[in-house]
């Protein structure tokens, strides 16, 4: 009885902090900060979390989840440097925490520091080989380096674990084939993405490029028109259609599209170049030289400017 009584007395005198648990008051502070975050009051959440984290004198009591939420708050505020500082500090105390590793890796990726991003994604996979964010993050790193086959090995693992994954990943997978001019596989996989979501213009653009590569020009132009219907404000889609029509030898249609485009963007050098190319093919030599001169003068050192300058010399 004496031993049991002493044990009970000892435990009753210990704080929850001594036992490694967050005291009740602390838990309430975290919940309050989390609620602020959920209410999109990110600055207030960051203030609360900063106080919550740094009031703990013992760094071992600084919770990984609090660091993660603080970093997320800074991300929402657009303060990515601060967010990364938070994650890196947290990893000093929680070096094997997968959400923190992934969060820091993603920010390095956004900053273009791919080597550092790869290192942290590798560490995350050591702790959790099936982590979806680490697999797709590493796939994107290899894709950005141009190692498309290597990127697909990570995507293959990801799809095996997540067969109903968001179609954006299937579209990125398709783009790796497109970049290697494997148009058949690119078309197959972008069609799968479109079956899940046909409202994304970029999916239709990938489909159009794959169809062009396969020689299915009617399909390619139809897909491009769908993309333009979804995003009529996108200049890149209009320019791609202009180029596609020109490559098909449909000079009148291409010129019509070009002139319409130039009404809103009269100094677009690529559009001016294709106006000149189409006009030249249609025998409108004078206007072709005029537009070519404009294209060359806007930015002479650019690729388009150099091409226009060279053509201008040949068309004299």
Language model segments and positions:
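Register position in tetratricopeptide repeats
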Residues: 38-39, 76, 110-111, 144-145, ...
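Canonical positions in the second alpha-helix
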Residues: 52, 56, 89-90, 123-124, ...
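Structural marker of alpha-solenoid helical repeat scaffolds
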Residues: 21, 55, 59, 93, ...
């Amino acid at each position: 009885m004496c031993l049991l009584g002493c044990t009970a007395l000892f435990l009753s005198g210990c704080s929850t902090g001594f036992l490694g648990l967050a005291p009740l008051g602390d838990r309430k502070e975290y919940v309050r900060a989390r609620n602020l975050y959920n209410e999109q009051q990110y600055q207030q959440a960051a203030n609360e979390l900063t106080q919550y984290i740094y009031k703990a004198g013992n760094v071992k009591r600084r919770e990984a989840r609090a660091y993660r939420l603080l970093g997320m708050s800074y991300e929402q505020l657009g303060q990515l440097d601060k967010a990364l500082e938070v994650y890196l500090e947290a990893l000093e105390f929680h070096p094997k925490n997968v959400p923190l590793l992934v969060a820091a890796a993603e920010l390095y990726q956004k900053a273009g520091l791919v080597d550092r991003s790869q290192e942290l994604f590798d560490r995350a996979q050591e702790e959790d080989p099936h982590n979806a964010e680490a697999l797709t993050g590493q796939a994107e790193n290899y894709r950005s380096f141009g190692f498309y086959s290597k990127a697909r090995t990570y995507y293959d693992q990801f799809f095996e674990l997540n067969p109903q994954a968001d179609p954006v990943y299937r579209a990125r997978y398709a783009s790796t084939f497109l970049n290697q001019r494997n148009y058949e596989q690119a078309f197959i996989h972008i069609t799968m993405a479109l079956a899940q979501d046909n409202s994304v213009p970029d999916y239709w653009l990938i489909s159009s490029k794959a169809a062009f590569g396969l020689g299915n020009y009617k399909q390619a132009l139809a897909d491009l028109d769908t993309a333009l219907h979804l995003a009529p404000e996108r200049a890149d889609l209009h320019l791609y259609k202009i180029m596609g029509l020109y490559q098909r030898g449909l000079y009148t249609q291409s010129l019509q599209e070009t002139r319409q485009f130039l009404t809103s963007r009269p100094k677009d050098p690529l559009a001016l170049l294709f106006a000149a190319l189409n006009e030249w093919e249609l025998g409108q030599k004078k206007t072709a030289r005029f537009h070519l001169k404009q294209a060359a003068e806007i930015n002479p050192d650019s690729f388009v400017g150099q091409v226009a300058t060279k053509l201008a010399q040949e068309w004299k």
